[in-house]
Amino acid sequence: MCGIFAAFKHEDIHNFKPKALQLSKKIRHRGPDWSGNAVMNSTIFVHERLAIVGLDSGAQPITSADGEYMLGVNGEIYNHIQLREMCSDYKFQTFSDCEPIIPLYLEHDIDAPKYLDGMFAFCLYDSKKDRIVAARDPIGVVTLYMGRSSQSPETVYFASELKCLTDVCDSIISFPPGHVYDSETDKITRYFTPDWLDEKRIPSTPVDYHAIRHSLEKAVRKRLMAEVPYGVLLSGGLDSSLIAAIAARETEKANADANEDNNVDEKQLAGIDDQGHLHTSGWSRLHSFAIGLPNAPDLQAARKVAKFIGSIHHEHTFTLQEGLDALDDVIYHLETYDVTTIRASTPMFLLSRKIKAQGVKMVLSGEGSDEIFGGYLYFAQAPSAAEFHTESVQRVKNLHLADCLRANKSTMAWGLEARVPFLDKDFLQLCMNIDPNEKMIKPKEGRIEKYILRKAFDTTDEPDVKPYLPEEILWRQKEQFSDGVGYSWIDGLRDTAERAISDAMFANPKADWGDDIPTTKEAYWYRLKFDAWFPQKTAADTVMRWIPKADWGCAEDPSGRYAKIHEKHVSA
């Protein structure tokens, strides 16, 4: 993954170039390995590179052999080997997994993103037509913003982070996932159109446990495509533990296959070949990483998992004060004032710095499972299967403003890439079409949250299959990440906010906040910090607040401890 900045149809592009380089420098943390830029006509692309695939020849922006097309990409394309074979008539200039986007555009025009399997945000410039095409991956795992300026209405700007655009744009949006922009029509249209996106359509497909297992294993395998050392974020919760368990098996298998093959081609592209075999580089054993306050529930669980799956485990702790000291930087990098995002991002931000210092550039993470399977404890209060499903679809649709934003920005703040197997297109297609009655939380029937995901990896009735996880982990109750790192983390944030925000301040919110009024002192405190970095109203308009369903009788605080079924429930 990397950082991109683009300005299309700038009236004075050559004099603007120094400013473009300055703006792109604001996201150099995303791509510390190399900086590149290219100008065609009145358009400039700037790219900050984090090299993971195509190390020697994958620098960007990529220009086609005829010099007519320019491409800047932030992301990873997992099916690039197959796409290269599809586009065999095209003269490839690099071994980058992203370059197939150019021949796909030549053949399929703005439908090109439909053929990509990966996480991405890209801008492609067609100099013959003086046209820019921009697109974002189906769920929004990778961040992308689009902006305009009333001072130069014809110019369109794109960037990986908000901070690149606030100096030059007075109108900024978070580019919608699964959409493509075409300057010829000046419209953003949806290219990702699975049937499950219609939240009014309630699926009725019975659960297939083996299909869930097989699909998630394949999703993890794809995401181990790398030419650098990689690891896995391991909280000790169900989601990260399953990803770690599968990744450990796939890493072991890939190494065994490589050792058996005496004719390994050193030029073999990293990725999945036509036979489904993984070609990757890295350590011979999976490395796992965990963080928490001393004696946190997550740390204890993560140790058990690491020992069980045989990973080389790295445990890091932080103090409450270290977390508080990092808040301003976290909000600057996250570009949000949402309470639950900031609570969960701070430990992830601190851990990412530690991981990068150990020479790792890529990690797998467990985001997306709670949205797909209704794993948040407040889902237990869903009045019906239909409402359960509708809420699940809404949560998946909004992931780009919540957990995906957190996973992307808190890691990329240190040049560390996070990949999320649960948000694989095929896995989503399978699991979002399961009858929601199968997903509902029914404690009286012994069906806890994410029951069908747990059951899919329960090998109790399969004596010939090695267990994936210890039983107490496979069936461990859901903890919000911000809870699992230590309950005193959230308590400490609240107490500090209570001291920082007086009753008088809280009773008199800023007039320019409009209807978006903080309902707690903690939220007020974060909003003030956000405004210090991003005072523009258009910046605040890109933020979404993550709040449980009030009309289900849920507490407003997003902490899982406020859910009635939590083992350590507290009252609001």
From Swiss-Prot:
It comes from the Eukaryota. Pfam families: Asn_synthase, GATase_7. Residues 2-186 form the Glutamine amidotransferase type-2 domain. Pathway: Amino-acid biosynthesis; L-asparagine biosynthesis; L-asparagine from L-aspartate (L-Gln route): step 1/1. SUPFAM superfamilies: Adenine nucleotide alpha hydrolases-like (SSF52402), N-terminal nucleophile aminohydrolases (Ntn hydrolases) (SSF56235). GO terms for biological process: asparagine biosynthetic process; L-asparagine biosynthetic process. Keywords: Amino-acid biosynthesis, Asparagine biosynthesis, ATP-binding, Glutamine amidotransferase, Ligase, Nucleotide-binding. L-glutamine binds at residues 49-53, 74-76, 97. Residues 194-545 form the Asparagine synthetase domain. The keyword Nucleotide-binding applies. GO terms for molecular function: asparagine synthase (glutamine-hydrolyzing) activity; ATP binding. It catalyses: L-aspartate + L-glutamine + ATP + H2O = L-asparagine + L-glutamate + AMP + diphosphate + H(+). ATP binds at residues 233, 291, 365-366. Present with 58200 molecules/cell in log phase SD medium. NCBIfam families: asn_synth_AEB (TIGR01536), PRK09431.1 (NF006949). This is Asparagine synthetase [glutamine-hydrolyzing] 2. The gene is ASN2.
